[in-house]
Amino acid sequence: MNIFNQLKQDIIVASRQLYNNQEIANTATIEIPKDSFNGDLSSNIAMIIAAKESIAPREVALKFKEVLITLPYIASIEIAGPGFINFTIKADSWQASIKDILQHEEKFFEIDIDKSKNINIEYVSANPTGPMHIGHARGAIYGDVLARILQKVSYSVTKEYYVNDAGSQINDLVSTVLLRYKEALGEQITIPAGLYPGEYLIPLGQILAKEYGNKLLTMNYAERFKIIKSFAVEKMLDLNRKDLADLGIKHDIFFSEQSLHDKGEIEETVKLLERMGLIYEGTLPAPKGKIHEEWDNRVQKLFKSTKYGDSQDRPIEKADGSWSYFASDLAYAKDKIERGANHLIYVLGADHSGYVKRIEAIVKALGKEQVKVDVKICQLVNFVENGVPVKMSKRLGSFASVQDVNHEVGKDIIRFMMLTRQNDKPLDFDLVKVKEQSRENPIFYVQYAHVRTISILSKAKELMPESYNNFESGKYDLSLLSSEEEIEIIKLLASWTKTLEASAKYFEPHRIAFYLINLASKFHSMWNFGKENSDYRFVIESNKELTLARLALASAIQKVIASGLEVIGVEPMNKM
């Protein structure tokens, strides 16, 4: 029995019985109180009903208490504050969740929230002009883990990378590769400021020289540009794909910005918005304060972005008449919606925080308020060693590439550590602590818990083979798991799917990492109690019945930790 789901269903039934209202009860929450003094679970149903029916919340809460106290798994109910209903659950109901994890594993870990949602999540979208830096990695991992979580709760999810292969940065890439090509032909070159001086483009010049000889130099500009651009963008994308693959990340779609231009989708989108009355000719307001020299006060085509909450309307054309980057964003959102997405998620870096309102405006307009949009910002990553900031130019190269850091610490450590802070908060990545075997290193602490549970089961199989066979046959008495420490762990295990649902609801993958750290901490504490008091040991040869129950507990911990690590794309370790 999933206690959280069961209580929610019983509250819905009670709401229908007491107030003939099931629909509003669906919006009620079942939460774990921050203070255990307030019981095991808490619901706000009384306050929701009270607001709807214009009744005092405590009066509503008391009526719910009369009905719900009769449920066989409820030990007690208390009314707190303005009308929160706090529930204490009977121990045997918590203990039964261990059996659900072990004997009905597939059903316990299965979550089905809403299969009608078709989510498109765009993340990384780094310019294809060079190796990915570690700042990209945070957004990449956040987006990838969020996609995994959303898939885990049964949403249909498309993972997308928007390839910025149109615009000035691509022109600069082509110019740089052309110079490297000339260099490969024996010409002395100088890379001008503003281009890409990195040595990673040298092999591209060499490949072109080998394939074309000096033929590219005799071609007209347009033909040469087309060849070099196609070649360079594809090679840079291959590099980015490898960087991502090394982090365990694979997108479903790499969508080309250039394709929007080539297929006329930008023109089509602008015409649609004109028919909707959302494009007009006007001037942008002057920046606040003194007049800026860069302010463009010409009459131009503008999108009515302010109608949808943006701070200003947005230009869709540049001064030279070409489409603006914003115009590409309009066409790209339209394309996603036409492909069937009804919820768009954009994962952006800290340097794009100013794009949030304009992207929301785009989707609200093109989705006609029927398509949901969320824009998530990933803040910066600061590298430290034992808490002391590291200058990346001296430590891991000029821009701390993903390859550098991956080589230094490994994929699993990077993935886990990127989730140890909420995405919109800066993250300190300690290059020393992440390799320590101590509780100060969260990924080690969690992996060590997984290894220990396997060690417990192996030890029992070796020392008590008959008892171990009984455990595998499901012959254990879970009522023996009655200590405060055991019940605390069991409650946490039972809340795993609740944590997963919350992570999906609020787009917060860090909740998974926090949960695993908390579970590992409680398990290690109980393990350490066993060093001081033999009654707390998991394998007690003189007490077969208690050992059987604790083997069930250890196995449940192992399965939940493995499930959590799998969700965030980290491979559980079986030995250290």
From Swiss-Prot:
Its EC number is 6.1.1.19. It is found in: Cytoplasm. GO terms for molecular function: arginine-tRNA ligase activity; ATP binding. Its main location: cytoplasm. GO terms for cellular component: cytoplasm. Keywords: Aminoacyl-tRNA synthetase, ATP-binding, Cytoplasm, Ligase, Nucleotide-binding, Protein biosynthesis. Transmembrane segments: none annotated. Disulfide bonds: none annotated. A motif ('HIGH' region) lies at residues 126-136. It holds the Pfam family DALR_1. It catalyses: tRNA(Arg) + L-arginine + ATP = L-arginyl-tRNA(Arg) + AMP + diphosphate. It comes from the Bacteria. InterPro entries: aa-tRNA-synth_I_CS, Arg-tRNA-ligase, Arg-tRNA-synth_N, Arg-tRNA-synth_N_sf, ArgRS_core, DALR_anticod-bd, Rossmann-like_a/b/a_fold, tRNAsynth_Ia_anticodon-bd. Signal peptide: none annotated. One of its GO terms (biological process) is arginyl-tRNA aminoacylation. Belongs to the class-I aminoacyl-tRNA synthetase family. Monomer. This is Arginine--tRNA ligase. It comes from Rickettsia africae (strain ESF-5). The gene is argS.
